[in-house]
């Protein structure tokens, strides 16, 4: 057994006693073997459950199964077509009814309105963050217009711009601008003073301070605003096309849904709705997911 007792040291020339010396010793590390679940190999089911894409596909499959069962139980195709009938109508719409071209028509208008709203949101947020009057301006405008449904502006859009693409872009900008600007401004104002002071201590200033510190710190809220704005844009676009009928002289997804409802092709109505859902899933899980992985997840800001 190692003696760990301390030996006193003699007095120093100044009359002070030096601290005691502890004898050196070594401890031998013994292997303990596997510890709990650390060394246990994962089962095939556990490995599959760790795949995010597979879990989401299982959720979609469960929804499709419940849809099919509920439609078969109701047995009324005019009210609720089955999933298989809707899938067949979707394929038929792609092959013969130009569903993809209609989807692209709607998507192109949506992207234009979304881009205009994004530019305006950046300008408004920049003014709001920089000046007090800008902050009051953004706060007042969002309080006024954010609760106002975009669909309520349809009569004004029809009166000012007529039936066409400009009217659709007008209501899209209204639908996207306010939630996007509100989330972006909230992201910048939520950056802590400690983080701001740390950036200044590192010599950051001007545009470098904004790009290097403020935007990354506020980006989770900005990304949330982009997602919310995208969802609002789709809702507004489909509702507007149901009223306008066409955009730029061509029918969009809203027109496809409206026309088939009038002709009682309910399976094609559901096919149009499924197309909107599929585009939304694609954008959410590809575009926004890519942005999230290469920004906030890479920076360790979200799990």
List the model feature ranges, each with a label.
Residues 143-179, 186-187:
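Generic hydrophobic transmembrane alpha-helix motif, especially the helices
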Residues 159, 237-266, 270, 275, ...:
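Glycine-rich helix-loop "coupling/hinge" segments at transmembrane-helix boundaries
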Residues 183-225:
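Short cytoplasmic-facing helical segments at TM-TM junctions of multi-pass membrane proteins
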Residues 1-61, 285-303:
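Transmembrane alpha-helical segments of polytopic membrane transport and secretion proteins
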Residues 170, 174, 207-240, 271, ...:
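Transmembrane alpha-helices
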Residues 112-142:
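Transmembrane-helix boundary motif in ABC transporter permease subunits
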Residues 41-49, 72-116, 255:
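Periplasmic/extracellular loop-to-transmembrane helix junction in inner-membrane transport proteins
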Residues 132, 189, 266, 270-303:
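C-terminal transmembrane helix and the adjacent membrane-cytosol boundary/short C-terminal tail
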């Amino acid at each position: 057994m190692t003696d760990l007792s301390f030996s006193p040291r003699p007095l120093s020339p100044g009359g002070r006693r030096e601290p005691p010396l502890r004898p050196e010793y070594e401890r031998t590390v013994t292997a303990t073997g596997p510890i709990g679940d650390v060394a246990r190999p994962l089962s095939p089911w556990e490995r599959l459950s760790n795949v995010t894409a597979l879990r989401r596909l299982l959720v979609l499959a469960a929804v499709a199964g419940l849809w099919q069962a509920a439609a078969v139980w109701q047995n009324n195709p005019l009210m609720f077509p089955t999933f298989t009938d809707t899938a067949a109508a979707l394929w038929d719409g792609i092959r013969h009814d130009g569903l993809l071209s209609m989807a692209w028509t709607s998507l192109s208008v949506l992207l234009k309105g979304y881009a205009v709203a994004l530019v305006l949101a950046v300008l408004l947020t920049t003014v709001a963050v920089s000046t007090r009057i800008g902050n009051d301006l953004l706060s007042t405008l969002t309080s006024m217009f954010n609760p106002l449904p975009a669909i309520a502006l349809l009569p004004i859009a029809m009166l000012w711009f007529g039936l066409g693409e400009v009217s659709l872009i007008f209501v899209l900008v209204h639908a996207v601008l306010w939630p996007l600007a509100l989330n972006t401004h909230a992201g910048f104002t939520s950056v802590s003073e400690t983080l701001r002071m740390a950036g200044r201590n590192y010599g950051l200033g001007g545009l470098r301070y904004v790009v290097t510190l403020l935007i990354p710190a506020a980006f989770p809220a900005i990304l949330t605003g982009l997602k919310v704005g995208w969802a609002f844009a789709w809702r507004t676009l489909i509702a507007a096309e149901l009223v306008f009928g066409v955009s730029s002289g061509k029918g969009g997804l809203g027109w496809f849904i409206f026309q088939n409802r009038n002709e009682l092709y309910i399976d094609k109505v559901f096919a149009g709705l499924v197309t909107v859902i599929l585009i939304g899933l694609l954008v959410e899980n590809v575009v926004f997911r890519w942005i999230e992985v290469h920004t906030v997840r890479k920076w360790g800001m979200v799990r």
